[in-house]
């Protein structure tokens, strides 16, 4: 705690033994008597360090005393010279000693406190030792009880071992039966596979024989094709002879062609005429439609002129009188509607306030109930914690049983390994069965392919027979043509022209070449198909041989695997026996410990159940009170809901009446708008017509002015009156026209303003309706 004031190094204990503390003189310091005789081991090092620091000071004091005793004369002589130095040194030493004394007193106080603490600790340890002795006695008693329980458990273990041995014997018997059945099934599958392989070999041999026969048939077909080619060369010569006959027939047919050409041209002309008639009819219909439209326009123009004349006859009213009365009515109606809406909003606001007050009251009741529930939940949590503490104690007791459970788990793992080995053996057997089945499927597919190839052979035979029939028919036709040619030659011996004969020869040569190409193609196709069939047969034969080899290898592998599986089964049986013995012993010990723990748990659970029943009775009583309060709150809520429903029905009725009134007013306004639009259209038509009339009047004036000028030249005596008379109507016409235009423009402006005001009012009405719907929706939801 405090750094040493003397030397920095440690002094061995032999130094203190060589210089005991009893040899100190009479004026030794007082701190040596305060050191306790028995010090704690933690503070021995500190005390030794303090003694080491104090040892040099003691030696210095001894030297001073000895020098004072032995040499009094010398000190008296040198007193005058060294008096001042010795006094100063002694004062410094005394000051240092005082500081050391104070420090040592503090350390002594601390050591006393530590000694008291150690005494308290020793007393506590003594108490703990007594408690441990008592616990050992109780543990010995418990051990004796456990030994007795183990003795009973051994009896149970023996019984369990006997039962487990019986079960193992039954399991082994069943396993042997399963193995025998599997081996029999495997042998049967192998026998079936061998029989199938033999059948496939036989089918391959039969296919080879068939292919040899087909090759012979193909050679014969090739020979027949060569013969047919020779016959075709002969038939070409016959066809050249028949060319003359064909030319004669063409000439005969050419004489009758013009009548057909005339009929075709007549039909084309008739179709063209019909198309032109249709186009003309369509044009007529379109012209009729345009005429009708023009007539309608003329009628509308006449009607507009009549209306314009009537309007001109009338006097133009001022613009102030054109304001409609329905705007005032609309404003008054809107004001009344707004007042009603305001009244309804006030009612809704009052209902909302009442509802909010009731909701607040209910929330307060719910909060109080929640507080009660939380208090009950806290009590339940306390009880649960007590239960958890007791459960923890039980778990501490169960920790001893976990060792036994681990041993049981090891035994179970050994048993699982044995089961896994058996499962792996079964899986290997399944794989063998699957391989056999897959080989069977592959053989079936190959057989199907072979059957398909055999099925294609009749089609090839049919094609060959068809070619032979075609050749026979060609022969018959050629013979017929030859006979006809001979007859014609006899009837008309004149030779045909050279050009026709050459053409017929070319055609016959082309037909000959085409027939040769067809025969060559058919022969090539037949050869290709025969080659393909041979290749397929050889490939299938090779594949079947490979499959047979693979099956033999698989059989050998399965036999080896069965032998290894037998060895594994024997090892697994031995391990199973050992594991069953260990499991039986562990089960007995577990049952004993479980019985003991079960009794202790039942006692503790009974105590906890009594406490919980008391607490549950209290909670049930409180819950019944809360349910009563909740029922009261529900009744009040239902009353409030009924009132809200009544208010809602009233508001719906008012809304329906308002909607009906609004619809009627809208219909009336729509009628009024239609009338105004009709008047507006009439006025626009009149304006357009007015423009037309002004143009007509200008043209009329331009036509009339030259005649007036001619009259003015002829009549010189009275030139002014005609001008006045001519200018007067023009001046009269101009102001009237301008006044009419001004009045019409004012009328149009008024109509536009009125339509804008109506549209604005409708928009405002729609917005109010939307606001009212939005305000009513929250009330409905509340």
UniProtKB/Swiss-Prot annotation:
It is found in: Cytoplasm; Nucleus. The keyword Zinc-finger does not apply. GO terms for cellular component: centriole; cytoplasm; nucleus. One of its GO terms (biological process) is cell differentiation. Residues 62-74, 208-218 have a biased composition (Basic and acidic residues). The keyword Nucleus applies. Pfam families: HCR. Keywords: Coiled coil, Cytoplasm, Developmental protein, Differentiation, Nucleus. Its main location: cytoplasm. Residues 82-314, 344-437, 498-691 form a coiled coil. Residues 62-82, 177-218 are annotated as: Disordered. May be a regulator of keratinocyte proliferation or differentiation. This is Coiled-coil alpha-helical rod protein 1. It comes from Pan troglodytes (Chimpanzee).
């Amino acid at each position: 705690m405090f750094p040493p004031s003397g030397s920095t190094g440690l002094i061995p204990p032999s130094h203190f033994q060589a210089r005991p503390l009893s040899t100190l003189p009479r004026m030794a310091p007082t701190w040596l008597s305060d050191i306790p005789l028995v010090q704690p081991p933690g503070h021995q090092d500190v005390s030794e360090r303090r003694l080491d620091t104090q040892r040099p000071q003691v030696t210095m004091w001894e030297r001073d005393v000895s020098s004072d005793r032995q040499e009094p004369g010398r000190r008296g002589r040198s007193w005058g010279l060294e008096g001042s130095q010795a006094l100063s040194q002694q004062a410094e030493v005394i000051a240092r000693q005082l500081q050391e004394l104070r420090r040592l007193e503090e350390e002594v106080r601390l050591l006393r406190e530590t000694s008291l603490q150690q005494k308290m600790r020793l007393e506590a340890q003594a108490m703990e030792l007594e408690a441990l002795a008592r616990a050992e006695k109780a543990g010995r008693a418990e051990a004796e009880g456990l030994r007795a329980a183990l003795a009973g458990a051994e009896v149970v273990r023996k019984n369990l071992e006997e039962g487990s041995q019986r079960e193992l014997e039954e399991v082994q018997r069943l396993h042997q039966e399963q193995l025998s059945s599997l081996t029999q099934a495997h042998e049967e599958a192998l026998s079936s596979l061998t029989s199938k392989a033999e059948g496939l070999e036989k089918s391959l041999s039969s296919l080879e024989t068939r292919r040899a026969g087909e090759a012979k048939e193909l050679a014969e077909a090739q020979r027949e094709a060569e013969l047919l080619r020779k016959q075709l060369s002969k038939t070409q010569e016959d066809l050249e002879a028949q060319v003359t006959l064909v030319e004669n027939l063409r000439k005969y047919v050419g004489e009758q062609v013009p009548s057909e050409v005339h009929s075709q041209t007549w039909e084309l002309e008739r179709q063209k005429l019909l198309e032109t008639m249709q186009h003309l009819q369509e044009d007529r219909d379109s012209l009729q439609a345009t005429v009708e439209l023009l007539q309608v326009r003329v009628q509308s123009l006449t009607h507009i002129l009549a209306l314009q004349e009537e309007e001109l006859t009338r006097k133009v009213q001022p613009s102030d009188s054109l304001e409609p009365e329905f705007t005032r009515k609309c404003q008054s109606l809107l004001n009344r509607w707004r007042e009603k809406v305001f009244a309804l909003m006030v009612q809704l606001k009052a209902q909302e306030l009442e509802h909010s007050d009731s909701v607040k009251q209910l929330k307060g009741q719910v909060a109080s109930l929640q507080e009660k529930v939380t208090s009950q939940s806290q009590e339940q949590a306390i009880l649960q914690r007590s239960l958890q503490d007791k459960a923890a104690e039980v778990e501490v007791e169960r920790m001893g049983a976990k060792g036994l459970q681990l041993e049981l788990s090891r035994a179970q793992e050994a048993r699982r390994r044995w089961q896994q080995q058996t499962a792996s053996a079964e899986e290997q057997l399944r794989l063998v069965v699957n391989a056999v089945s897959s080989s069977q499927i592959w053989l079936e597919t190959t057989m199907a392919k072979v059957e398909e190839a055999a099925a294609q052979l009749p089609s090839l035979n049919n094609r060959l027979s068809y070619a032979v029939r075609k050749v026979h028919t060609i022969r018959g036709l050629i013979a017929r043509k030859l006979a006809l040619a001979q007859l014609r030659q006899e009837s008309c011996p004149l030779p045909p022209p050279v050009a026709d004969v050459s053409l017929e020869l070319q055609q016959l040569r082309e037909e000959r070449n085409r027939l040769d190409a067809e025969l060559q193609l058919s022969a090539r196709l037949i050869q290709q198909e025969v080659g393909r069939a041979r290749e397929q047969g050889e490939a299938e034969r090779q594949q079947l041989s490979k499959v047979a080899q693979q099956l033999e290898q698989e059989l050998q592998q399965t036999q080896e695997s069965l032998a290894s599986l037998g060895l594994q089964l024997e090892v697994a049986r031995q391990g199973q026996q050992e594991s069953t013995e260990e499991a039986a012993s562990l089960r007995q010990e577990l049952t004993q410990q479980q019985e003991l723990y079960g009794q202790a748990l039942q006692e503790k659970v009974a105590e906890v159940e009594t406490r919980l029943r008391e607490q549950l009775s209290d909670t049930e009583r409180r819950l019944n009170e809360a349910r009563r309060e909740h029922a009261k709150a529900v009744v009040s809520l239902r009353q409030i809901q009924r009132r809200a429903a009544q208010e809602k029905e009233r508001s719906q009725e008012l809304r329906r009446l308002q909607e009906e009134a609004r619809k009627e007013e809208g219909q009336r306004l729509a009628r009024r708008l239609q009338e105004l639009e009709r008047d507006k259209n009439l006025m626009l038509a009149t304006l357009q017509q007015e423009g037309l009339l002004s143009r007509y009047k200008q043209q009329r004036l331009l036509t009339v002015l030259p005649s007036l000028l001619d009259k003015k030249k002829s009549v010189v005596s009275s030139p002014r009156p005609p001008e006045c008379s001519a200018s007067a109507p023009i001046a009269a016409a101009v102001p009237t026209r301008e006044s009419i235009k001004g009045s019409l423009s004012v009328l149009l402006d008024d109509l536009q303003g009125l339509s804008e005001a109506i549209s604005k009012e409708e928009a405002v009405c729609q917005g109010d309706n939307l606001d009212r719907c939005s305000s009513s929706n929250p009330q409905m939801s509340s």
